[in-house]
Regions:
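A short structural micro-motif
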Residues: 53, 132-135
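Short, well-ordered loop/turn and helix-capping segments at boundaries between secondary-structure elements
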Residues: 8, 106, 117-118, 155, ...
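Short glycine/threonine-rich catalytic loop with a Thr-x-Gly-x-Asp
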Residues: 96-112, 122-123, 142
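Phosphate-handling active-site elements
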Residues: 116-129, 137-143
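Charged C-terminal helix
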Residues: 134-168
Length: 168
């Protein structure tokens, strides 16, 4: 199982739901750096006891999931929340509604995996991925499908690179 290899693992969607009935075993199996990416429905299946923690406070809920699982958690939504193992948390508020379509989460996961492969640490990779995901979706506008988002990302990255703050 990938979770026992000692290698960084990125899990999302069905890779999480498969553990719905054995969540506690799943948490115990995570022995290496792990990133979990989910929306509320997937989150509720993997962390059923955290649904209404503290009146539904998203930060409390996601911090609880990170502590319980030992994974960096990204909970997708209108305000995407990322929580690190040390409790640091950020909310990304630039998630336009056109991101709520099939395949878009796969693009986010792949973007984050790419950042991780380049040496970015999980918390920063999650937040950078979520932010760029939102910017690219906003740039494209309505009618977005996964392929459109992939095609929009290079121009967003070029735009950032051309800014003085990102120059060498």
């Amino acid at each position: 199982m990938a979770l026992r290899t000692g290698k960084l693992v990125v899990l999302e969607a069905d890779a999480l739901i498969v553990f719905e009935d054995i969540a506690s075993l799943f948490y115990e199996t995570i022995t290496a750096p792990c990133v979990m990416i989910s929306h509320d429905g997937e989150f509720a299946k993997v962390f059923p006891d955290l649904g209404d923690v503290d009146g539904g406070d998203t930060f409390v809920k996601v911090r609880g999931a990170a502590k319980l699982s030992g994974a960096v958690i990204l909970l997708k939504g209108a305000d995407t929340v990322v929580v690190a193992l040390d409790g640091r948390a950020v909310a990304n508020e630039n998630a336009p509604t056109n991101l709520a379509t099939g395949g878009i989460g796969d693009v986010l996961s792949e973007l984050i995996a790419g950042f991780l492969a380049q040496g970015m640490v999980p918390f920063e990779a999650d937040f950078a991925g979520a932010w760029l995901h939102g910017v690219a979706a906003s740039e494209f506008g309505s009618g977005l499908v996964a392929g459109d988002l992939i095609n929009a990302l290079p121009s967003v990255l070029r735009s950032l690179k051309s800014r003085k703050a990102f120059s060498k």
